[in-house]
């Protein structure tokens, strides 16, 4: 969950440096620019940008802010107002994987049932 990672990184830097202003701009830069630079070293399609020929990885978040949101406070809204459970739609490499919180590319119920069965078997193996 990228948003939770952002929150943790934000708190860790402030705590470590005893500075409430620390890492305010660095964390989103690491997440949105740094991650793309690293990934672009290893993948052939451009990542971290919306343009023709790029991977087209996008999420749509259901977020209705209580206060005005603009370019000057967007990071604050993302950091304090958004979490991963608000993701409604996910597009990866141009393919819609989840729309309106419904997975389109796999059988979620079967996967969950298989996981529950495997977890039960593991618990039985561990606990006897």
Identify what each model region corresponds to.
Residues 17-20, 38, 46, 89, ...:
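Secondary-structure transition/capping residues
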Residues 101-128:
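Intein/HINT protein-splicing elements and their conserved insertion hotspots or analogous self-processing inserts
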């Amino acid at each position: 969950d990228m948003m939770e990672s952002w929150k943790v990184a934000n708190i860790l830097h402030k705590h470590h440096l005893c500075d409430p202003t620390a890492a305010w701009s660095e964390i989103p830069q690491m997440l949105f620019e740094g991650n793309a630079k690293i990934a672009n070293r290893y993948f052939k399609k451009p990542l971290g940008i919306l343009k023709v020929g790029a991977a087209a990885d996008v999420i749509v978040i259901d977020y209705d802010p209580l206060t005005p949101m603009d370019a000057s406070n967007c990071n604050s809204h993302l950091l304090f107002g958004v979490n991963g459970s608000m993701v409604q739609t996910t597009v990866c490499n141009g393919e819609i994987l989840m729309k309106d919180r419904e997975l389109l590319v796999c059988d979620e119920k079967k996967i969950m049932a298989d996981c529950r069965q495997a977890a039960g078997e593991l618990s039985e193996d561990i606990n006897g």
